Amino acid sequence: MKTTKSKKLYKQALKLMPGGVNSPVRAFKAVGGNPLFIAKAKGSKIYDVDGNEYIDYVLSWGPLILGHAYPSVVKALKKAIEKGTSYGAPTELEIKLATLVKKAFPSIEKLRFVNSGTEATMSAIRVARGFTKRNKVIKFEGCYHGHVDGLLVSAGSGGATFSIPDSLGVPQSYTSETIVLPFNDINTFKNTLKEHWKDIACVIVEPVVGNMGCILPKDEFLKVLRNETQKYGIVLIFDEVMTGFRVSFGGAQQYYGVKPDLTCLGKVIGGGLPVGAYGGKKEIMALVAPDGGVYQAGTLSGNPIAMTAGIETLKVLSKASVYKRLEKTMQYLEEGLKDSAKQAGINVKFYRAGTMFCTYFTENEVIDAKTAKTSDTEKFKQFFLGMLQKGVYIAPSQFEAGFISLAHSEKDIEKTVQAAYKIFKKL
């Protein structure tokens, strides 16, 4: 497989952009080698500038649940762009997309569109603080909620700690209001709320942790979060930027039967264009300007191009047959990868929620960030590079989720499973 043009472009990019990329994981630092530069994409495939074809399980990090360049989305975008790219004024398109989102997520009574998942989580926390008149935030180790200063933190020693910054340029004063707890640890969570509840404005969580692979909530974890936050008057925020429309049409909250106070969305609702949204109970959202005193704004928020792509995507997803088809494809991939690993005699743990998944190279059950980190990242590196050579593109990090789309065919899955078996045997 030749990647001459990609290598040449990467050298040029390194002179212009930090690491040659505009988001760190794209640089392939966790797996070695040079990143691929993509020329085009269609359906389940991406094509690099050297003409190589890959079955894509990254799908722009989740948004493209219909596949690349889905015909009805492309058609709608062509019409929309001829009318103008942005108006900086309200449009009917915002109402249409908001209505579709509300239909899928009954817990969202009012919502506000923004331009990214980071903006959504940042804004939701601001509103929660305004509503409760408290300052502290609980998040969980391994959960990523965008590059918000106050949430770029890591836990210190012990179960519950007041956090230190996880990035240069973030003052400790910004993160001193953030408490990091282990995911799936019910007792530590209960004890922390019992001790600090008077100071805690909100609890924010990825209901399925997609930024440490794919860590599922165990037992009654999400229900405990709901019950305990209600008891102490704390706002519960579900960060469904990744799980929204991925785990099910109504996201993780529908799948697990737990309704948060606020929900953050992104990725799928933009159909591949930049978008985010946050929303929830009317009495909380009533604080958002211009109705209330919590300020939040955006030049391109609700722009007609992103709204159009989102509307067309959700229209397709609202059809009853779509999730049945996605589930069938996902089951086929899951069974194939598990069988391949077993036949090859390699220990892996496969987890999935709806159409997002991860294969961990470990013998341990993965229930939190600590157990996720027992994965053999060197084996994953070899697996990634081997799959790439065989025309299968997975996330270039052990700790990122993979995704399927409506465009993935049985033939795609069969090729993927066959490639995985051959690579597993070499590990």
From Swiss-Prot:
SUPFAM superfamilies: PLP-dependent transferases (SSF53383)
EC number(s) per entry: 5.4.3.8
Family matches, as PANTHER family: GLUTAMATE-1-SEMIALDEHYDE 2,1-AMINOMUTASE, GLUTAMATE-1-SEMIALDEHYDE 2,1-AMINOMUTASE 1, CHLOROPLASTIC-RELATED
Cellular component per GO, a single term: cytoplasm
Residues the record lists as N6-(pyridoxal phosphate)lysine modifications: 267
Catalytic activity reported: (S)-4-amino-5-oxopentanoate = 5-aminolevulinate
Compartmental location: Cytoplasm
A GO biological process held by the record: protoporphyrinogen IX biosynthetic process
Keyword terms, alphabetized: Cytoplasm, Isomerase, Porphyrin biosynthesis, Pyridoxal phosphate
Organism: Thermodesulfovibrio yellowstonii (strain ATCC 51303 / DSM 11347 / YP87)
Entry superkingdom: Bacteria
Database matches in CDD domains: OAT_like (cd00610)
Name used for this protein in its record: Glutamate-1-semialdehyde 2,1-aminomutase
Subunit organization: Homodimer.
Family classification: Belongs to the class-III pyridoxal-phosphate-dependent aminotransferase family. HemL subfamily.
Transmembrane recorded as keyword: no
Pathway in which the depicted protein is active: Porphyrin-containing compound metabolism; protoporphyrin-IX biosynthesis; 5-aminolevulinate from L-glutamyl-tRNA(Glu): step 2/2
Molecular function in Gene Ontology: glutamate-1-semialdehyde 2,1-aminomutase activity; pyridoxal phosphate binding; transaminase activity
CC cofactor: pyridoxal 5'-phosphate
